[in-house]
Amino acid sequence: MARAPLLQLSGISLTFGGDPVFSSLDLVIQPGDRIALVGRNGSGKSTLMKVMAGLQEPDRGLRSLTPGTAVGYMEQDPDLSAFETLGDFAAATLPPGEEYRVAMAAEGLKFRPETPVATASGGERRRAALARLMAEAPELMLLDEPTNHLDIEAIEWLEAELGATRSAFVMISHDRA
C-alpha cells in the first residue's frame, strides 16, 4: 500500500510583477524525505517554501497537506520583537509544560534562553529559531537558510540533528556545501 504524502504541490504557478517565479511545479514530500532547494539569490526558493508552508497563495495549482500533519517553518529572518527573551520566542508555540524541549535544544546549540531579544546577535536569534523548530518536532520541517549566522559548532549540531530526525525536511540554501 502506498503511503500518503505529507505534502503535495500540484501544478503550482506563481508570478511577481508579471514575471514567472515558477510554473506548473509538482512536488511530493513523503515521510522521512530529505530535500534541498539550492539556487541563486532571488530565484524563488523562499517563495516556494512559503507556498509549502501555506503562507503564500499560488496563482494556480493545489497545495494538499495530509490532515493531522504537523508542519514547522523556520523562516529566514523571523520577527522576535514581540518577545522579551530568546527562550520566550523558542517556547511560544509549545503546549504548557513542554518548555523543557527548548532547554534540551538550547543545551545542544549552546545558546542561553534568558538572553534578551533586544541584545541578541544574529547567530543567537538563529539558534533560538532552530531550538523552536526542533522543540516542536513536527513531521515536516521547512528550513529557510538555517545555517545563516551560525558558527561551525552550531552547523555541526544542526547536521547531526537533521541526520537523526525521523521528520521529513526541506532545506533551502544558496551554498552547495
List the model feature ranges, each with a label.
Residues 1-177:
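ABC ATP-binding cassette signature C-motif
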